[in-house]
Amino acid sequence: MDMLDPGLDPASSATAAAAASHDKGPEAEEGVELQEGGDGPGAEEQTAVAIASVQQAAFGDHNIQYQFRTESNGGQVTYRVVQVTDGQLDGQGDAAGAVSVVSTAAFAGGQQAVTQVGVDGAAQRPGPAAASVPTGPAAPFPLAVIQNPFSNGGSPAAEAVSGEARFAYFPASSVGDTTAVSVQTTDQSLQAGGQFYVMMTPQDVLQTGTQRTIAPRTHPYSPKIDGTRTPRDERRRAQHNEVERRRRDKINNWIVQLSKIIPDCHADNSKTGASKGGILSKACDYIRELRQTNQRMQETFKEAERLQMDNELLRQQIEELKNENALLRAQLQQHNLEMVGESTRQ
């Protein structure tokens, strides 16, 4: 397939058409027509447009591959791919064949709404007459948005450009002889009927750091408004109040018991009623004092246990010495010896 990259005239919204033949057989020949349409006299300037590859299933011959790429991010560019027979190329027939429409716009900011207009038979034939697109009623049908870059089989991958121009593809079976598509930027949500698909390459899906727009809310949010209270709500409210009252009474009773246990607080409470905060503060001080006293008592108890063990060892030593002394006296008596201390006492 021959590649054709025409230069578009920025001063006018003229049509840039390119026709190429691929595997022309004895029965039919397929051509490609490329058109650029602006929104009006004030449409932004468009730059070069190239053809490479689009989904193969959209066209009759699966060996043909197309690619649409915009080198400028601004404005709106509409491409119309028309299958042309031999008779249409020679100007013998006015009826157009299967038509596939691909439109693109820079999805830079706001929400995009897809509208559908009708075209006559002249708009589908290659030539200058295809530049004018009269509007007409048409029924909505499913569409698919293909994010650039995309590839089809062995076609070269498109280069990623800032702005990420996207393509809305309408198959030939859904587009009739008198229909076309234009993309306009509006403030409303997408009004196209049917299902909405977003297809892109894995590199674009796994790419990190890119900001993605969230789908707008299709229905307005209605805040919950409380109506009149039912008897069931009143009964639950009364039960809740009763539970809270019992809980407060229990807390007050425990605080009164604390005031009676604490010595200083009990004396003060007899004179003037102490507050709950004062009672709890004195209770905390009393608990800290009890902990310190308990720690001192534990240390004293350990010391007493150590002294008791020492006394037990001394008592055992005294018993051993007494037994040894008794044995020595028995030996002296056997040898008829008198102890010096005993003779002196006598």
From Swiss-Prot:
Pfam families found in the cross-reference section: HLH (PF00010)
Stretch list, region Leucine-zipper: 307-328
Locations listed in the record: Nucleus
Biased composition (Basic and acidic residues): 226-244
GO biological process: cellular response to glucose stimulus; glucose mediated signaling pathway; lactation; lipid homeostasis; positive regulation of DNA-templated transcription; positive regulation of transcription by RNA polymerase II; positive regulation of transcription from RNA polymerase II promoter by glucose; regulation of transcription by RNA polymerase II
Single GO molecular function: protein heterodimerization activity
bHLH domain sequence ranges: 235-290
One GO cellular component term noted in the UniProt record for this chain: nucleus
Highest taxon of source: Eukaryota
Swiss-Prot/TrEMBL keywords: DNA-binding, Nucleus, Transcription, Transcription regulation
Tagged with keyword Chaperone: no
Chief place where the protein resides: nucleus
Span list, region Disordered: 1-44, 215-244
Compositionally biased region (Low complexity): 11-20
InterPro entries associated with the record: bHLH_dom, HLH_DNA-bd_sf, USF
SMART domains, sorted: HLH
PROSITE patterns attached to this UniProt entry: BHLH
SUPFAM superfamilies named in the record: HLH, helix-loop-helix DNA-binding domain (SSF47459)
Stated role: Transcription factor that binds to a symmetrical DNA sequence (E-boxes) (5'-CACGTG-3') that is found in a variety of viral and cellular promoters.
Quaternary assembly: Interacts with MAF. Efficient DNA binding requires dimerization with another bHLH protein. Binds DNA as a homodimer or a heterodimer (USF1/USF2).
Protein name (record): Upstream stimulatory factor 2
Lineage: Eukaryota, Metazoa, Chordata, Craniata, Vertebrata
